[in-house]
């Protein structure tokens, strides 16, 4: 019997890097509302007392960058100096330029279907049947812990909670099946006055226990709640934040490979983002069709070229049909040209700020989480 541990982490919406991601995607959303053909690559940097918004944007839209940035920061919960960061009074610097004309000529075409990829690169998508959302369990529950932290903070149930937090979940596997939670780490920013006893009890009873399956917890499960003992200084006062620095948190928690490209602040012409969403869509439909228990897709592109330069399917020995057949089915049922996948997944809409915390995958409200091709794939593969 093979036994092993696997761990994934998540961070809260108030983590400095996630503040930056949410600002970048809020800018993207506001632009897409006005200009569906915009080219956006928006980067944000946050540190004590300031937010710098920069990048390359070509659009006919007008967005009040300063007020939008302040709103995102305040919505997260950084509303007064007691938090160490205040959206009302921080400096907001704007360093946005236009997208290079050299890139434009490779992307834009008279026929939209000939639209070239905005850059070269490799993208991965993954799905597994170990959770109902066809995502790896460790990252799924790490995200849910962070969502619960925000919920009890914003509701006032645990009034001493502050926005910055991190979680980590270690699962124990036997013969590739989850048998329990080995360890949980949860660190959360808090107010000065709360005692360690109240903090530990509140986190355990209001965040951890309501989220993790009781059958996975045992007397052997280890809990590390604020293991340094103090986490008052947090957010951008504790660490600077930068767009695109939580790419493993954003995807599969290390359970699958990653092409290296970040998502937030990029419009759908950037295949770093849109093709990674399409790869998840393909992998999820293959698993939902029962063609594999686990599936990883790799796509690659060349700048200015429409068709993918490669498509790879890996099923880790769990496939019900040959991987070569799956590649053929992917080519038949999914249009993976940049414009094709944008249309297939309806990506020109202002949905991106919501993706920028708690993971881009495994959340059913997003169009790349649909399993509407599963039945067609199953029939075409010859499975009953």
From Swiss-Prot:
The UniProt record lists the keyword ATP-binding: yes
Known pathway: Amino-acid biosynthesis; S-adenosyl-L-methionine biosynthesis; S-adenosyl-L-methionine from L-methionine: step 1/1
Top-level EC class as recorded in UniProt: transferase
Residues that hold ATP according to the record: 15, 164-166, 230-231, 239, 245-246, 262, 266
CDD domains from the UniProt entry: S-AdoMet_synt
Residues noted as binding Mg(2+) in the record, renumbered to the chain: 17
Residues that span the membrane, as ranges: none
Keyword set includes Phosphoprotein: no
InterPro entries: ADOMET_SYNTHASE_CS (IPR022631), S-AdoMet_synt_C (IPR022630), S-AdoMet_synt_central (IPR022629), S-AdoMet_synt_N (IPR022628), S-AdoMet_synthetase (IPR002133), S-AdoMet_synthetase_sfam (IPR022636)
Annotated positions binding L-methionine: 56, 99, 239, 270
EC id: 2.5.1.6
Top-level taxon: Bacteria
Catalytic activity: L-methionine + ATP + H2O = S-adenosyl-L-methionine + phosphate + diphosphate
Binding annotation for K(+): 43
Cofactor: Mg(2+); K(+)
Molecular function terms from GO: ATP binding; magnesium ion binding; methionine adenosyltransferase activity
Keywords, ordered alphabetically: ATP-binding, Cytoplasm, Magnesium, Metal-binding, Nucleotide-binding, One-carbon metabolism, Potassium, Transferase
Complex formation: Homotetramer; dimer of dimers.
Function: Catalyzes the formation of S-adenosylmethionine (AdoMet) from methionine and ATP. The overall synthetic reaction is composed of two sequential steps, AdoMet formation and the subsequent tripolyphosphate hydrolysis which occurs prior to release of AdoMet from the enzyme.
Family statement: Belongs to the AdoMet synthase family.
Protein name: S-adenosylmethionine synthase
Annotated source species: Haemophilus influenzae (strain 86-028NP)
């Amino acid at each position: 019997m093979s036994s092993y541990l696997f761990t994934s982490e998540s961070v809260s919406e108030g983590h400095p890097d996630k503040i930056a991601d949410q600002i970048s995607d809020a800018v993207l959303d506001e632009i897409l509302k006005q200009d569906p053909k915009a080219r956006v690559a928006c980067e944000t940097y946050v540190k004590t007392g300031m937010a710098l918004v920069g990048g390359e944007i070509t659009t006919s839209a007008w967005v009040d960058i300063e007020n939008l940035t302040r709103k995102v920061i305040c919505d997260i919960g950084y509303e007064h100096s007691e938090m160490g960061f205040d959206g009302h009074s921080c400096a907001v610097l704007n360093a946005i330029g236009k997208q290079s004309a050299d890139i434009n000529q490779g992307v834009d075409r008279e026929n939209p279907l000939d639209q070239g990829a905005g850059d070269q690169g490799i993208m991965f998508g993954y799905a597994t049947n170990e959770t109902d959302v066809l995502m790896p369990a460790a990252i799924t529950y790490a995200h849910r812990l962070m969502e619960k932290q925000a919920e009890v903070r914003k509701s006032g149930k645990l009034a001493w909670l502050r926005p910055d937090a991190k979680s980590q979940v270690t699962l124990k596997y036997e013969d590739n099946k989850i048998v329990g939670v080995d360890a949980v780490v949860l660190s959360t920013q808090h107010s000065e006055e709360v005692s360690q006893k109240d903090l530990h009890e509140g986190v355990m009873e209001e965040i951890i226990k309501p989220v993790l399956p009781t059958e996975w917890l045992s007397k052997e499960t280890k809990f590390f709640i604020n293991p340094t003992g103090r986490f008052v200084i947090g957010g951008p006062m504790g660490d600077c934040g930068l767009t695109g620095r939580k790419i493993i948190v954003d995807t599969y928690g290390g359970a699958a490979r990653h092409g290296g490209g970040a998502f937030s602040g990029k419009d759908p012409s950037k295949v770093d983002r849109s093709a990674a969403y399409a790869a998840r869509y393909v992998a999820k439909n293959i698993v939902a069709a029962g063609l594999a228990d686990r599936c990883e897709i790799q796509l690659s592109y060349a700048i200015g070229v429409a068709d993918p330069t490669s498509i790879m399917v890996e099923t880790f020995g769990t496939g019900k049909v040959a991987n070569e057949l799956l590649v053929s089915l992917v080519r038949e049922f999914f249009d993976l040209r940049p414009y094709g996948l944008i249309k297939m997944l309806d990506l020109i809409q202002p949905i991106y700020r919501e993706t920028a915390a708690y993971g881009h995958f495994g959340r059913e409200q997003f169009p790349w989480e649909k399993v509407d091709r599963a039945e067609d794939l199953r029939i075409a593969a010859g499975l009953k």
